[in-house]
């Protein structure tokens, strides 16, 4: 499947937010103004239509979680099929992805790095190696780092970095053992207020 391999900062500038969490890993060059649109002089943002606003929000969320368009649409279809609020269901499905859980637990500094740990077979779920980033973690699942991967400096550095972040209440992590428990599905109030999932629902409902 196709995956964007271009400059990630360019996408962050397009969406006006740090999509790939780079600022939490290293200082971003002062010349690279995230709040300024791409282009040498930061082209002025055009006034967006309702559709444009909805599309931008969908693209932002899709890029935050590192999901391709077809896969994102499938997540939406599944969210709409489930009982409850479709937008909230969508975010919960994205939060339940193994690569995201690995990031939330602090084993990877970014979701991209966490996805790499999963694909390189460094992650176990309930004692079994899982190398599928989209694997859905469910309540009470135990996610851990494989023994041979525990020595990786990037994993230790990520855990140190995670100490500076707010700890998710729906997870329980033992940094010394490099393992964590997915205690429950996060509620909407647990997640970022910077995401407007209602715009995505409006977009796909057309």
Curated annotation (Swiss-Prot):
Residues 96-157 form the S4 RNA-binding domain. CDD domains: S4. This is Small ribosomal subunit protein uS4. Belongs to the universal ribosomal protein uS4 family. The keyword Ribosomal protein applies. Keywords: Ribonucleoprotein, Ribosomal protein, RNA-binding, rRNA-binding. The gene is rpsD. Signal peptide: none annotated. One of the primary rRNA binding proteins, it binds directly to 16S rRNA where it nucleates assembly of the body of the 30S subunit. GO terms for molecular function: rRNA binding; structural constituent of ribosome. It comes from Sodalis glossinidius (strain morsitans). Pfam families: Ribosomal_S4 (PF00163), S4 (PF01479).
């Amino acid at each position: 499947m196709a995956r964007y391999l271009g400059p990630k900062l360019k996408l962050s500038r397009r969406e006006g937010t740090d999509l790939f969490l780079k600022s939490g890993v290293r200082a971003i060059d002062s010349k690279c103004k995230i709040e300024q649109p791409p282009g040498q002089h930061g082209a002025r943002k055009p006034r967006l239509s309702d559709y444009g606003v909805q599309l931008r929000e969908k693209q932002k969320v899709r890029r935050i979680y590192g999901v391709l368009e077809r896969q994102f649409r499938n997540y939406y279809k599944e969210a709409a099929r489930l009982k409850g609020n479709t937008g909230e269901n969508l975010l919960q499905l994205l939060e339940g992805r193994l690569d995201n859980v690995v990031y939330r637990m602090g084993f990877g500094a970014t979701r991209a790095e966490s996805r790499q740990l999963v694909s390189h077979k460094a992650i176990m779920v309930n004692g079994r190696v899982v190398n599928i980033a989209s694997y859905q973690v469910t309540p009470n699942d135990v996610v851990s780092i494989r023994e041979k991967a525990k020595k990786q400096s990037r994993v230790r550095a990520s855990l140190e970095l995670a100490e500076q972040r707010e700890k998710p209440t729906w997870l329980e992590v033992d940094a010394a053992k490099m393992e964590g428990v997915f205690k429950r599905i996060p509620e909407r109030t647990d997640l970022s207020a910077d995401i407007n999932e209602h715009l995505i629902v409006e977009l796909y409902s057309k």
